């Protein structure tokens, strides 16, 4: 096993994990941005089975969605990967990971306290390091020879700050994604300085609160399901969970990112690629079609689609 890789094991977190880091280490971690760890969240009630579904990849090989996501992560130079899962799911996820299972650490989110809590469950795993964060119910398809995760990691290393991938998204889809507003600071690399973060806004709220010059009318920069975050996010989350203890309201990652934008440089980037969300209606089908049309069997798939369209009959 290569140096730095973690054997497949399972950790359990029911309480909000403590997070402590010296000022010196915090400064050095951001200065280096040596991103070697990744966290994949897959513990949500509606999310937990989606990474286990089978797809045919661009090479025509059948594998789980999880395996495809892990390959995306590995291509970005990541050495250690944690997957946040629901209790009892480790065996299924280990099997779905196939030959990549030895790279994984499984972290059980024993209480269903939401996405932000799932991310914070990995605080001990990420420690004082910046890390790549992905959701387990998205597929990422690059339009270049460099994977989406590799693009984002390269940008984070160059910018030495937290960075979220975003995608121009029509307002009809805002109910599914967080959205950001900000100033375009690098047109060539499509980098934005984030000043506003909203959690699944309505079109009216987005129009009133988000300003992104240059986007088409009715379109907003929505999260891609992929971030590189600094250790500061865990300090912010720890404080938010402490303040929220005993209350019925939830802690959202969106709020933590908004605080992050106030305390350190935080940017967003449009990548050369697209996200495909398994969690929406026909999402898995759309992801499979995208893979097929970008792969070696494209012509065969197109012929099948033409035949299907020619013979399909609606009610």
Regions found by a protein language model. Name each.
Residues 5-6:
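Leucine-biased recognition of intrinsically disordered, low-complexity hydrophobic segments
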Residues 23-47, 54-133, 139-144:
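Conserved N-terminal catalytic core of the sugar/cofactor nucleotidyltransferase
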Residues 48, 92-93, 236, 256:
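Phosphate- and divalent-cation-binding pockets in alpha/beta enzyme and binding domains
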Residues 66, 122, 137, 180, ...:
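Residue-level signal for inorganic ion chemistry
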Residues 142-227, 231, 235:
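Conserved core of the sugar-phosphate nucleotidyltransferase
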Residues 206-315:
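Conserved alpha/beta core of the MobA/IspD/sugar-nucleotide pyrophosphorylase nucleotidyltransferase superfamily
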């Amino acid at each position: 096993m290569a140096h730095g890789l973690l054997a497949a094991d399972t950790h359990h977190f029911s309480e909000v994990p403590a997070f402590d880091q010296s000022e010196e280490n915090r400064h050095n971690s951001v200065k280096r941005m040596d991103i070697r760890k990744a966290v994949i969240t897959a513990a949500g009630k509606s999310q937990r089975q989606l990474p286990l579904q089978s797809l045919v990849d661009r090479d025509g090989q059948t594998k789980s969605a999880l395996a495809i996501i892990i390959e995306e992560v590995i291509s970005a130079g990541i050495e250690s990967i944690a997957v946040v899962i629901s209790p009892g799911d480790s065996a299924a996820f280990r099997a779905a990971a196939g030959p990549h299972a030895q790279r994984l650490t499984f972290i059980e989110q024993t209480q269903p306290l939401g996405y932000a809590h799932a991310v914070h469950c990995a605080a001990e795993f990420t420690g004082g390091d910046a890390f790549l964060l992905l959701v387990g119910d998205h597929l990422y398809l690059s339009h270049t020879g460099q994977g989406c995760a590799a693009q984002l990691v390269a940008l984070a290393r160059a910018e030495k700050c937290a960075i979220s991938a975003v995608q121009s998204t029509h307002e009809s889809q805002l109910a599914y994604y967080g959205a950001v507003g900000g100033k375009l600071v690098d047109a060539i690399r499509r980098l934005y300085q984030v000043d506003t973060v909203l959690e699944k806004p309505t079109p009216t709220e987005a129009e009133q609160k988000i300003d992104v010059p240059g986007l088409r009318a009715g379109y907003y920069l929505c999260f891609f399901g992929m971030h590189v975050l600094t250790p500061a996010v865990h300090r912010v989350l720890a404080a938010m969970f402490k303040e929220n203890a005993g209350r019925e309201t939830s802690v959202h990652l969106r709020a933590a990112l908004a605080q992050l934008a106030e305390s350190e440089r935080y940017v967003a980037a449009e990548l050369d690629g697209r996200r495909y969300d398994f969690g929406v209606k026909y999402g898995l089908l759309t992801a499979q079609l995208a893979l097929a049309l970008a792969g070696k069997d494209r012509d065969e798939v197109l012929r099948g689609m033409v035949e299907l369209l020619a013979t399909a009959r609606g009610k």
